[in-house]
């Protein structure tokens, strides 16, 4: 099993933590990670695009001229698609672009991205992130002490509200829990900052 250094909030190395190789030490499957990232990005699309078809365009209830005898082509409504100002045929309608992948695929993708971060030495383990109250400055000091100055995903245990609130106003900092950390979040982050308790939760969920 791989060992990573365990730091406290002041940036001091206090111990090491053992990581489960079945989760943090596998050969990353780039193809699966790609599929999951595409799926998650698709789910983020709003899909609120819409056009008006002939029934939605205002007006056009009266037949523009009689059926026969004018010499012109027969018409039933000035909102038919062939008219300027008419309805659109087969235009985009509101829809969801999201789709689900099998659970095994999603779990393998998570293991792959966690393993990649550990292999690239971009995984920082911290003993705990505990704050007496939500303080952005205190959280910024923790990141500074740990020499984290790039885009970081902080994974904390469930219920650590003060950590979430403290980091909310910091640029390039995203806070998640083991349950909400997505493959897309992990891929987008330059570094992972994970509490010891969160590591245990990740291993429990993905084991």
Curated annotation (Swiss-Prot):
<dbReference type="GO" id="GO:1990904">
    <property type="term" value="C:ribonucleoprotein complex"/>
</dbReference>
<dbReference type="GO" id="GO:0005840">
    <property type="term" value="C:ribosome"/>
</dbReference>
<dbReference type="GO" id="GO:0019843">
    <property type="term" value="F:rRNA binding"/>
</dbReference>
<dbReference type="InterPro" id="IPR023574">
    <property type="entry name" value="Ribosomal_uL4_dom_sf"/>
</dbReference>
<dbReference type="Pfam" id="PF00573">
    <property type="entry name" value="Ribosomal_L4"/>
</dbReference>
<dbReference type="GO" id="GO:0006412">
    <property type="term" value="P:translation"/>
</dbReference>
<protein>
    <recommendedName>
        <fullName>Large ribosomal subunit protein uL4</fullName>
    </recommendedName>
</protein>
<comment type="function">
    <text>Forms part of the polypeptide exit tunnel.</text>
</comment>
<dbReference type="InterPro" id="IPR002136">
    <property type="entry name" value="Ribosomal_uL4"/>
</dbReference>
<keyword id="KW-0694">RNA-binding</keyword>
<dbReference type="InterPro" id="IPR013005">
    <property type="entry name" value="Ribosomal_uL4-like"/>
</dbReference>
<comment type="similarity">
    <text>Belongs to the universal ribosomal protein uL4 family.</text>
</comment>
<comment type="subunit">
    <text>Part of the 50S ribosomal subunit.</text>
</comment>
<keyword id="KW-0687">Ribonucleoprotein</keyword>
<dbReference type="GO" id="GO:0003735">
    <property type="term" value="F:structural constituent of ribosome"/>
</dbReference>
<comment type="function">
    <text>One of the primary rRNA binding proteins, this protein initially binds near the 5'-end of the 23S rRNA. It is important during the early stages of 50S assembly. It makes multiple contacts with different domains of the 23S rRNA in the assembled 50S subunit and ribosome.</text>
</comment>
<keyword id="KW-0699">rRNA-binding</keyword>
<keyword id="KW-0689">Ribosomal protein</keyword>
<feature type="region of interest" description="Disordered">
    <location>
        <begin position="49"/>
        <end position="78"/>
    </location>
</feature>
